């Protein structure tokens, strides 16, 4: 009996010891999450070698190299770094303050505007190099990443902030990727750096909204997220429910939305940066939070990506937040129709016809192409109520401004034709005035032609961002993640609004 008691006592002691060791292991396993230590890293640039000349460090890179007694130059020579754009190495324990140093190629020194590519290569090279370096240091668990300007502080901020961002919401806290804190290194141009962070954070906001799973980003949740993001910035957000939509007779939008149990919502957003009586720039963003294709269901393999059909609305939220943060001196009004497209007994059927606010009829011939239907009546309503000076949903002036903005931000635009030829491609019918379907594959041009018929004589631009604001699958930019939502073209529109507000660039 005594031996049995001793055995039980021994088992309890072993069990307690095991549990204590297990707790100790768990504490060690989670120690990194609880640790408050700061790990610093720095990104410096190196220009590509030309001919027999060896790679040359940027001015800030040379200062840092002098600080560490030429160690960086020696390491560049030993590792064979060529300064090729986006190629680099991370060196550890070179400096007492910075645990890791990322040396990244910035491409050719003195790169400027490329007329053939329609892009400012110097600015884009800074984005790429800063983004590659910041992400490399993020993978080394650097909590604070210092990035040199590479002669373009604003663009370096954009590239690094876009590169280190992650959509982590649905991962366990201990498994989430560290989002490094970014600081400008060795440059007095802090204003440009902050502008770049504002623009990148606005695009990251659009990326988060678009990348969130559809069940976590319904029209109602999107509306609440918009209120949370914009109202603290002094932006007015009005949330319009089904009753309001019906009272305004926005029938084309309701036809698209009625197949889902999720109630549709329209957001009216107003940013006032100048005199209230000044006419606003009107923005419309398609906010289909999930597009199943309705009765014409899309293939199952690609259904998930169609949560990104609200990328236009997400970009609108992002660049209005940036406009407020940058205090742009102009008035902006945005209308965001939010809904889901689902198959059900209430869903729109091929061949349905609606009467628009202008008295014309529009046939819903192809239910898988619902964007035109969702935007038609809201576009007519917004023009009537707000009487804008410009509608961004084609004048030469507007395109030239977008072309310039795209060249400066690295997110370029390409003007598509708006010829009468495409109007003739719209399927003719004796029973309605127009339709959302046309002959041939030029669906972007056909959609623009249909919407163009609804716009009176004001400056107008239709941005088709299909497969641009959604998943990045082919040749992604180095500072964006593959197979994730891009948030494009948020920064281009922010730059466009800046050009409209400040024509002299000040």
Question: What are these regions, as identified by a protein language model?
Answer:
Residues 73-80, 84-86, 223-506:
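A generic structural signal for tightly packed, nonpolar segments enriched in small/aliphatic residues
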Residues 2-278, 480, 487, 502-505:
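Glycine-/small-residue-enriched capping loops at alpha/beta junctions
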């Amino acid at each position: 009996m005594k031996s049995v008691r001793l055995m039980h006592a021994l088992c309890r002691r072993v069990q307690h010891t095991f549990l204590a060791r297990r707790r100790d292991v768990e504490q060690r396993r989670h120690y990194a999450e609880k640790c408050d230590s700061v790990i610093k890293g720095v990104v410096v640039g190196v220009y590509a070698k030309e001919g027999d000349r060896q790679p040359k460090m940027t001015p800030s890179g040379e200062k840092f190299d002098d600080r560490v007694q030429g160690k960086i130059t020696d390491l560049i020579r030993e590792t064979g770094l060529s300064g090729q754009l986006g190629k680099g190495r991370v060196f550890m324990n070179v400096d007492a303050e910075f645990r890791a140093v990322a040396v990244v190629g910035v491409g050719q020194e003195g790169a400027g505007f490329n007329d053939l590519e329609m892009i400012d290569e110097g600015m884009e090279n800074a984005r790429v190099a800063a983004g590659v370096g910041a992400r490399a240091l993020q993978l080394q668990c650097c909590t604070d990443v210092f990035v040199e300007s590479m002669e373009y502080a604003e663009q370096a901020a954009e590239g690094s902030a876009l590169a280190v961002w992650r959509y982590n919401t649905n991962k366990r806290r201990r498994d989430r990727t560290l989002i490094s804190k970014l600081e400008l290194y060795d440059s007095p141009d802090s204003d440009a750096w902050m502008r770049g962070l504002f623009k990148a954070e606005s695009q990251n906001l659009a990326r988060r909204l678009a990348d969130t799973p559809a069940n976590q980003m319904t029209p109602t949740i999107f509306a609440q997220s918009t209120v949370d993001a914009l109202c603290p910035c002094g932006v007015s957000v009005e949330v319009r429910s089904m009753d309001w939509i019906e009272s305004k007779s926005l029938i084309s939008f309701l036809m698209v939305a009625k197949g889902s149990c999720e109630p549709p919502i329209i957001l009216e957003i107003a940013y006032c940066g100048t005199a209230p009586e000044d006419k606003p720039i009107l923005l419309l963003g398609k906010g289909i939070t999930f597009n199943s294709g309705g009765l014409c269901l899309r293939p199952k393999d690609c259904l998930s990506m169609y949560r990104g059909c609200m990328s236009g609305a997400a970009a609108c939220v992002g660049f209005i937040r940036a406009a407020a943060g940058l205090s742009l001196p102009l008035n902006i009004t945005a209308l965001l129709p939010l809904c889901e497209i689902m198959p059900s007994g209430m869903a729109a059927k091929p061949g349905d016809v609606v009467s628009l606010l202008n008295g014309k009829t529009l046939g819903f011939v192809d239910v898988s192409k619902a964007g035109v239907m969702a935007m038609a009546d809201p576009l007519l309503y917004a023009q009537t109520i707000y009487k804008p000076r410009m509608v961004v949903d084609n004048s030469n002036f507007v395109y030239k401004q977008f072309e310039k903005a795209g060249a400066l931000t690295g997110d370029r635009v390409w003007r598509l034709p708006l010829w009468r030829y495409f109007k003739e491609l719209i399927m003719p019918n004796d029973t309605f005035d127009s339709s959302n379907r046309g002959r041939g594959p030029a669906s972007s041009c056909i959609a623009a032609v249909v919407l163009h018929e609804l716009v009176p004589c004001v400056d107008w631009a239709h941005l088709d961002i299909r497969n641009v604001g959604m998943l990045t699958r082919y040749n992604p930019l180095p500072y964006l993640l593959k197979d994730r939502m891009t948030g494009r073209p948020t920064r281009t529109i922010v730059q466009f609004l800046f050009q409209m507000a400040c024509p002299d660039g000040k």
